[in-house]
Amino acid sequence: MATPSNLVANRGRRFKWAIEFGSGGSRGRGERGGLQDSMYPVGYSDKQVPDTSVQESDHILVEKRCWDIALGPLKQIPMNLFIMYMAGNTISIFPIMMVCMMAWRPIQALLATPATFKLLESSGQRFLQGLVYLIGNLLGLALAVYKCQSMGLLPTHASDWLAFIEPPERMEYTGGGLLL
């Protein structure tokens, strides 16, 4: 019978349930006596098993996850193109909201770039992945600017700047035939 101090000491250990079909009995009677054998159910091993849940991550999976993060903005570009097509070029609430969201997401991602690069630190190709991430966000921002230009929201013509042009000075004043 196990003492209370042994039970407390064994509480932190991880044990493994296993049934060994090749041995004489499923409870491993060769290791334990008959009285102690009745304490454990069938298939329970009282030997400590190494903790497999806290192992080193597989290098291939880490690289794949880092590339998924880096390629995320590029994967959004086809959806942004579809949204641009569906929104049209008219100026109304819906297309303007779509353009604002298309511009806001890359800006927000570019502002959070240091946090994203911390996720890429475990990768061996972090410079290339960071460059791909940056290019993808800049392409998303360029699409939003292009959509603003195609909707006529960017001041690209001289008539857009009339409020800032000084009115021309009059060179002469003319009047009618009446004297006042």
Curated annotation (Swiss-Prot):
In this entry, the parts of the chain located on the Cytoplasmic side of the membrane are: 1-63, 118-124
Tell me which domain of life the UniProt entry assigns to the organism this sequence originates from. Answer: Eukaryota
- Give the matching Pfam families: EMC4 (PF06417)
Where exactly are the transmembrane stretches of this chain?
A: 64-84, 96-117, 125-145
The biological process GO terms on file are: protein insertion into ER membrane by stop-transfer membrane-anchor sequence; tail-anchored membrane protein insertion into ER membrane
**Which keywords, in A-to-Z order, does the entry hold?**
Endoplasmic reticulum, Membrane, Transmembrane, Transmembrane helix
* One Gene Ontology cellular component: membrane
Disulphide bonds annotated for this chain are: none
InterPro entries named in the record: TMEM85/Emc4
Tell me if Transcription is a UniProt keyword of this record.
no
- List the Lumenal topological domains: 85-95, 146-180
Q: Where found, per UniProt?
A: Endoplasmic reticulum membrane
Q: Does the keyword Membrane apply?
A: yes
Q: How does it sit in the membrane?
A: Multi-pass membrane protein
Q: Which PANTHER family match?
A: ER MEMBRANE PROTEIN COMPLEX SUBUNIT 4
Main function: Part of the endoplasmic reticulum membrane protein complex (EMC) that enables the energy-independent insertion into endoplasmic reticulum membranes of newly synthesized membrane proteins. Preferentially accommodates proteins with transmembrane domains that are weakly hydrophobic or contain destabilizing features such as charged and aromatic residues. Involved in the cotranslational insertion of multi-pass membrane proteins in which stop-transfer membrane-anchor sequences become ER membrane spanning helices.
| Record's subunit section | Component of the ER membrane protein complex (EMC).
The entry sums up its family as follows: Belongs to the EMC4 family.
Name it: ER membrane protein complex subunit 4
Species whose genome carries this gene: Xenopus tropicalis
The organism's lineage is:
Eukaryota, Metazoa, Chordata, Craniata, Vertebrata
